[in-house]
């Protein structure tokens, strides 16, 4: 046996959780000894759930106050303020996403650790149950051999060798030895009730653990989906998606606090058991198994003497005595009574099988096998199980913090979306630099192309007369130039009216540029048609 398995030592987190003050619902101090049937002890575990409920209430109150203050606060939305709000919302979403991913990672580890611990507990319970069942089967089989099978052989031999009184005395002595074996076997504990309870406990533990593991797995997936979809709503500026996911985030926040309450109560209660498991087992098995036997299996120290040693020794001596008697009858009685050989060989085979069963029973009754299962069960529940519960509690706290952060970022993002839409609505639809107008123009093929100040129609006029006019400043109104633009085939909304209004002269060309300009104008005339 490995040295680490010789003695159970409670880990530090068990000692720390056991030292947590146990208070009832009326704030009275409660004994921390593990007693799940005691109402006051149940109230002390329920009080931990009440603390988690208070934390949830304070969290919701804080979020409500924050939402009200954010929605009612009016601020001047300058360009710098909008940039700051956008940056704040972005970084808040990033931090919340990182917290959510970290929480799910911690939760996966804690869920796996708890599941491993529970499976180790179930495996140890099944092994112990198999050992107890094997003990009962061996005791029952040996009792059957001694009381039924051996009696039948002895009865037939008594009829065969009835003429010899000394042989009859040998048979009676063997019958007495068989009675001693049955008496010693009846003194061994019957584990039937223990195996029934262990089977029930194993099945209940497996059932609860499966749905616990599955519930946390679904909660992890829900947290990730809500966090990712909320970040997607922020990125796409979808108010509907953001609002629905924030509502789901509040639900997940409630589930996180509820899981924290369950984890805290389970961790503290299990730590109370793991602090002194021997005492609890001794107090609850006294009516079924002798306390000396229970203590022998729980402690399994070299200083303890096996309570079954005397019974097993008597069993072994009785079998040895009967084998000697059968050997003498085979040697001396068979020559006189040949028909007795079959029954004597049957008794010899029966005694050999009983001796094999005795060795198996001795190995099963030894404390080392069951004590190892006991230590494995404690390791699974007190080390891996409680450690996983602590990580699950940390997951609940991180998830609550992450979704609280997302909920705080929601109203700011909502106001930012509304202000952005309002700024778009304030822009004139006829403004060519309006992004909405540009999108409409891009999807409307019937709308004419945008012409510059030097349009193709003005180029045609320049071809007819290339002499630069006198550079005079015109004081004509803007509408006159707009009408001129219409006559030349342009769009008055897209002409550079301020340039005309300043009285800027048209472009002039030197004699060297005239052939180049005329060739360009001819090429433009081939691609565009103008009204006559």
Swiss-Prot record:
<keyword id="KW-0406">Ion transport</keyword>
<feature type="transmembrane region" description="Helical; Name=1">
    <location>
        <begin position="45"/>
        <end position="65"/>
    </location>
</feature>
<protein>
    <recommendedName>
        <fullName>Protein tweety homolog 2</fullName>
    </recommendedName>
</protein>
<feature type="glycosylation site" description="N-linked (GlcNAc...) asparagine">
    <location>
        <position position="129"/>
    </location>
</feature>
<keyword id="KW-0597">Phosphoprotein</keyword>
<keyword id="KW-1133">Transmembrane helix</keyword>
<keyword id="KW-0812">Transmembrane</keyword>
<comment type="subunit">
    <text>Forms cis-homodimers in the presence of Ca(+2) and forms monomers and trans-dimers in the absence of Ca(2+). Interacts with NEDD4L.</text>
</comment>
<keyword id="KW-1015">Disulfide bond</keyword>
<keyword id="KW-0106">Calcium</keyword>
<keyword id="KW-0325">Glycoprotein</keyword>
<dbReference type="GO" id="GO:0005509">
    <property type="term" value="F:calcium ion binding"/>
</dbReference>
<feature type="topological domain" description="Extracellular">
    <location>
        <begin position="109"/>
        <end position="213"/>
    </location>
</feature>
<feature type="glycosylation site" description="N-linked (GlcNAc...) asparagine">
    <location>
        <position position="352"/>
    </location>
</feature>
<feature type="topological domain" description="Cytoplasmic">
    <location>
        <begin position="66"/>
        <end position="87"/>
    </location>
</feature>
<feature type="topological domain" description="Cytoplasmic">
    <location>
        <begin position="235"/>
        <end position="240"/>
    </location>
</feature>
<comment type="function">
    <text>Calcium-independent, swelling-dependent volume-regulated anion channel (VRAC-swell) which plays a pivotal role in the process of regulatory volume decrease (RVD) in the brain through the efflux of anions like chloride and organic osmolytes like glutamate. Probable large-conductance Ca(2+)-activated chloride channel.</text>
</comment>
<dbReference type="GO" id="GO:0005886">
    <property type="term" value="C:plasma membrane"/>
</dbReference>
<keyword id="KW-0407">Ion channel</keyword>
<keyword id="KW-0868">Chloride</keyword>
<dbReference type="InterPro" id="IPR006990">
    <property type="entry name" value="Tweety"/>
</dbReference>
<feature type="disulfide bond">
    <location>
        <begin position="274"/>
        <end position="382"/>
    </location>
</feature>
<keyword id="KW-1003">Cell membrane</keyword>
<feature type="transmembrane region" description="Helical; Name=3">
    <location>
        <begin position="214"/>
        <end position="234"/>
    </location>
</feature>
<feature type="topological domain" description="Extracellular">
    <location>
        <begin position="262"/>
        <end position="385"/>
    </location>
</feature>
<keyword id="KW-0472">Membrane</keyword>
<comment type="similarity">
    <text>Belongs to the tweety family.</text>
</comment>
<feature type="transmembrane region" description="Helical; Name=4">
    <location>
        <begin position="241"/>
        <end position="261"/>
    </location>
</feature>
<feature type="binding site">
    <location>
        <position position="116"/>
    </location>
    <ligand>
        <name>Ca(2+)</name>
    </ligand>
</feature>
<feature type="modified residue" description="Phosphoserine">
    <location>
        <position position="504"/>
    </location>
</feature>
<feature type="disulfide bond">
    <location>
        <begin position="300"/>
        <end position="367"/>
    </location>
</feature>
<keyword id="KW-0813">Transport</keyword>
<dbReference type="GO" id="GO:0016020">
    <property type="term" value="C:membrane"/>
</dbReference>
<feature type="glycosylation site" description="N-linked (GlcNAc...) asparagine">
    <location>
        <position position="283"/>
    </location>
</feature>
<keyword id="KW-0869">Chloride channel</keyword>
<dbReference type="GO" id="GO:0072320">
    <property type="term" value="F:volume-sensitive chloride channel activity"/>
</dbReference>
<feature type="binding site">
    <location>
        <position position="113"/>
    </location>
    <ligand>
        <name>Ca(2+)</name>
    </ligand>
</feature>
<dbReference type="GO" id="GO:0015813">
    <property type="term" value="P:L-glutamate transmembrane transport"/>
</dbReference>
<feature type="site" description="Essential for the formation of the channel-pore">
    <location>
        <position position="164"/>
    </location>
</feature>
<feature type="transmembrane region" description="Helical; Name=5">
    <location>
        <begin position="386"/>
        <end position="406"/>
    </location>
</feature>
<feature type="topological domain" description="Cytoplasmic">
    <location>
        <begin position="407"/>
        <end position="532"/>
    </location>
</feature>
<feature type="short sequence motif" description="PY-motif; mediates interaction with NEDD4L">
    <location>
        <begin position="506"/>
        <end position="509"/>
    </location>
</feature>
């Amino acid at each position: 046996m490995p040295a680490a398995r010789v003695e159970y030592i409670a880990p530090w987190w068990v000692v720390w959780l056991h030292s947590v003050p146990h208070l009832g619902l009326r704030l009275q101090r409660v004994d921390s000894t593990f007693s799940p049937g005691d109402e006051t002890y149940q109230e002390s575990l329920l009080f931990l759930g009440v603390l988690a409920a208070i934390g949830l209430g304070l969290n919701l109150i804080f979020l409500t106050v924050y939402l009200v203050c954010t929605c009612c606060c009016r601020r001047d939305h300058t360009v710098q303020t909008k940039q700051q709000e956008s940056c704040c919302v972005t970084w808040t979403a990033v931090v919340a996403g990182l917290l959510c991913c970290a929480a799910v990672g911690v939760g996966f580890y804690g869920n796996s650790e708890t599941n491993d611990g529970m499976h180790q507990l179930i495996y140890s319970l099944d092994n112990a149950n198999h050992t107890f069942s094997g003990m009962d089967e061996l005791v029952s089989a040996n009792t059957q051999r001694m009381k039924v099978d051996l009696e039948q052989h002895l009865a037939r031999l008594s009829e065969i060798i009835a003429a010899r009184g000394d042989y009859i005395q040998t048979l009676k002595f063997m019958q007495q030895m068989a009675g001693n074996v049955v008496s010693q076997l009846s003194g061994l504990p019957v584990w039937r009730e223990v195996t029934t309870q262990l089977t029930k406990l194993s099945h209940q533990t497996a059932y609860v653990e499966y749905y616990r593991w599955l519930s946390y797995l679904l909660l992890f997936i829900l947290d990730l989906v809500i966090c990712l979809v909320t970040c997607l709503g922020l990125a796409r500026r979808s108010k509907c998606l953001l609002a629905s996911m924030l509502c789901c985030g509040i639900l997940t926040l409630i589930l996180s606090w509820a899981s924290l309450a369950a984890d805290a109560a389970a961790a503290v209660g299990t730590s109370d058991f793991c602090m002194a498991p021997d005492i609890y087992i001794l107090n609850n098995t006294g009516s079924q198994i002798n306390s000396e036997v229970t203590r022998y299996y729980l402690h399994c120290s070299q200083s303890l003497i096996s309570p079954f040693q005397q019974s097993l020794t008597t069993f072994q001596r009785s079998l040895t005595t009967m084998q000697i008697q059968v050997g003498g009858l085979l040697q001396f009685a068979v020559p006189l009574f040949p028909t007795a050989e079959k029954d004597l060989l049957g008794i010899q085979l029966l005694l050999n099988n009983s001796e094999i069963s005795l060795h198996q029973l001795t190995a099963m009754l030894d404390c080392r096998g069951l004590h190892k299962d006991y230590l494995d069960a404690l390791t699974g529940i007190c080390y891996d199980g409680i450690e996983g519960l602590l990580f699950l509690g940390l997951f609940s706290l991180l998830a609550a913090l992450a979704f609280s952060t997302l909920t705080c970022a929601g109203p700011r993002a909502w106001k930012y979306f509304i202000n952005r839409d309002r700024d778009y609505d304030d822009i004139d639809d006829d403004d060519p630099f309006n992004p909405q107008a540009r999108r409409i123009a891009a999807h409307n093929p019937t709308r004419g192309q945008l012409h510059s100040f030097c349009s193709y129609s003005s180029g045609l006029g320049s071809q007819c007369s290339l002499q630069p006019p006198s550079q005079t400043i015109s004081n004509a109104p803007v509408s006159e130039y707009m009408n001129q633009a219409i006559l030349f085939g342009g769009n008055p909304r897209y002409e550079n009216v301020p340039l005309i209004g300043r009285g800027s002269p048209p472009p002039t060309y030197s004699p060297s540029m005239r052939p180049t300009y005329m060739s360009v104008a001819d090429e433009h005339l081939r691609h565009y048609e103008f009204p006559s």
